[in-house]
Amino acid sequence: MGMIPGRAGAARLVIVGAHYDHVGVRNGQLYPGADDNASGVAAMLAVAGALTGQVTEASILFVAFDAEEQGLRGARHFVNHPPVDLRSVTAMVNLDMVGRGDANTLVVAGTSYTPSLRAVVADAARGRELAIAFGYDRPSAAGERGGDWTHSSDHGPFHDAGVPFLYFGVENHGDYHKPTDTADKIPAGFYTEVTQVVLDTVRRLAGGERSGGRDSAP
């Protein structure tokens, strides 16, 4: 975990998370997990680096979760034994598989529960060369394409605890949970655009001002 303190201190927090575990090795075969979820961890670190030194109202807590692939155990432990007051968390931003999207599309779930967050993401994505697909967070959508992703990753336990969330991700692809999920298949252009949208979203959520730090993610 790492914290960028804001003017409000612990009274107002934004959590940015990504799980760092993957399948590992099965039958002697390495599963690299480039998209799931090295892409999310690297994007989180880029956002943290870009925001370091900038002035924000809310404090920003960055968390790398373990054991997501074993039932969201890391996130559940965090929520069950929170090191911060969850009532002060205005949003949990979860990055899970953000490296490669069909038709240049980034999925953003969570806005059905907290509609005000949709405008925050839309503003952050304006002018970017990617499409934003909102939704994927309604129980009634279970039979639809994409379905309901409310509990599909580390944001789930936070949602159950009453914390608003934004889940940035992509549809499953043919290399999901396979040894072929390698870094060479992540398009640099798409990944850069996604990371910039996440950065601008977090900056808006935290009430950030563009001063003192880098203006974009490396």
What are these regions (language model features)?
Residues G9, V55-T56, F65-Y167:
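Metal-dependent peptidase/peptidase-like ectodomains
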Residues V41-G49, R76, A119-D123, G156, ...:
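Solvent-exposed, polar/charged alpha-helical surfaces in well-ordered, non-transmembrane soluble domains
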Residues G6-L13:
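Proline/glycine-enriched tight loop/beta-turn segments at coil->beta junctions
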Residues G2, V16-G71, V198:
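Alpha-helical metal-binding/catalytic segments enriched in His/Glu/Asp
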